[in-house]
Amino acid sequence: MIRPRTALAAVGLAVLAAALWWRKNPSACPYGQRFWVEAPHPFITRDRLADVLEPATGERILEIGPGTGYYTLHLADAVGREGALEIFDIQQQMLDHTMRRVGEHGLSNVTPTRGDATSLPHPDDSFDAVVLVTVLGEIPEREAALAEIKRVLRPGGRLVVGELFGDPHFQAFGSLQRRCAAAGLSFEIRSGPRLGFFARFRA
């Protein structure tokens, strides 16, 4: 008979091994495991995102990796009918799921696009702001993605990145700041502890 402690230790080791493998092999959270992105987000709350992003009516915002729309509906409300929110994801199922929620809430200012964040299909200076929450670490070529984000941001546009410790692809604040600086994005503010924060950068 297996003792409870032994079983618990085995499960813990399996979870740790999976997390380490996932960290060494960056990839998007599969749609079949979407419960991870639908869970409550300590530290990186919707209200804190709004405080850091400071979205305004009429703005054009790009959300990369919306998951199942945890932040999407609030972003769409914030920019209003005069604004536009584009959600961008490598997985069509995530986009479809989010757009169903958008329809249920009667929003008409959200547009989905499928693609790779290292090759954004948008003209230069397209957006007032770009948002990524627990997404940057899932992109194998992070430097290329940040360069693309800088390209599509209007001069003075904002990039807001959210990170949460415990995510297998967690990006520590210091590392994030260095990567953004190398891409030409200047750090402005951080809200939240280093274990869970939003950071804003300016193009």
Regions found by a protein language model. Give the residues of each.
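Conserved alpha-helix/loop element of class I SAM-dependent methyltransferases that forms part
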Residues: P40-T57
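Hydrophobic alpha-helical topogenic segments used for membrane insertion/localization
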Residues: I2-W21
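A short glycine-rich, Lys/Arg-flanked "PGG" loop and its adjoining helix->strand segment in the class I
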Residues: A76, E143-R158
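A short acidic, Gly/Pro-enriched loop at the edge of an enzyme's catalytic core
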Residues: T118-V130
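Class I SAM-dependent methyltransferase SAM/SAH-binding core
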Residues: L62-S119
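A short SAM/SAH-binding and catalytic strip from SAM-dependent methyltransferases
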Residues: D128-E141
